[in-house]
Amino acid sequence: MIAMEGGAGNISTKMALEDTILTPRFYTTDFAAMDRLNVDLVRREWDAVMAELRADHNRKHFVRTPEFEKDLNELPEALRLEFKDFLVSSLTAEFSGCVLYAEIKKRITNPDIRELFSYMSRDEARHAGFINEILKDHGIGVDLGFLTKVKKYTYFKPKFIFYATYLSEKIGYARYITIYRQMERHPERQFHPIFKWFERWCNDEFRHGEAFALLMRADPKLLSGLNKLWIKFFLLAVFATMHVRDHMRPAFYEALGMPVDEYDMRVFRITSEISRQVFPVMLDIDNPRFWAGLNQLRKVSEAIADAKAQGGVMGAIKRAVLPLKAALTFGRLYMLPAKSNELPREIRLQPAW
């Protein structure tokens, strides 16, 4: 452990408070609609998922060991900064889920749904707390109480919460398990002990995603008609955001020994394969135009960052024009043909990747 750095904790909190298209957000929703949810259509599989959550297999997993005391300042500067960004972003995403799930639990009486969100908020609080303790060990902890009070909240209808959080949980599983498997193959690249925790950690994310899959399959209209267009939108938004964000951490992925595009493709494949359990449409991630569009979005995002740094009149003009270019690029990506998927009779999956 190292001494607290003056103001460092505030810097981490400011990072977590950032509201951009690339940063994790806090959400609120229609709690009355949540209270009316009915899972009778998937009762057998629902009870099985709830039994797993009730068992709390990871209740003793998130305990730091002495190896966590290694000074982050021993890392090369670029890697240290990007790893810190990775931790703060991960913490914000986990804590966002914790806040939303806890609020849903507090505001509803439906016993099935209330029990689910009780367990999921428990898990997300545990994840966020574990990351924050690591940050605090190095004098850069995030003030979670302050974050709860001042972070902007975005309202989503329940169906949008389901689409977004299902993808967030499943892509979180895919990201963590991909890094964990890489560390299994190349232990010499494990520059921080947190990666050893990722296998069991990501199983929590997987179980949460299973619950959201069942909530959607319990209401077939969420997966038909015009809602297919919304599903395609959320798939593209989540994949595109991840791709752009990952390219902002080149030193991090170099240290892991995984080129960003290779890592992203692996995560996209796992997430797409898993989402066949619930989504009737899939993105064609093997279409060369899909990757060309993602790379164009990345370049526009980099140009926007450069324009902000440039300042002045020209910088302001670029900041006004470039988001339009990003929107057009996203629109072209959205218009690419998607793949149809026939939903399986059995919904539940096991984390076998």
From Swiss-Prot:
* UniProt name for this protein: Aerobic magnesium-protoporphyrin IX monomethyl ester [oxidative] cyclase
List the catalysed reactions: Mg-protoporphyrin IX 13-monomethyl ester + 3 NADPH + 3 O2 + 2 H(+) = 3,8-divinyl protochlorophyllide a + 3 NADP(+) + 5 H2O
- Write the signal peptide boundaries: none
Check the record and name the InterPro entries matching this protein: AcsF, Ferritin-like_SF, Rr_diiron-bd_dom
An example GO biological process term is: light-independent bacteriochlorophyll biosynthetic process
Q: Does the keyword Transport apply?
A: no
Q: What class of enzyme is it?
A: oxidoreductase
In its UniProt entry, the species of origin is given as Bradyrhizobium sp. (strain BTAi1 / ATCC BAA-1182)
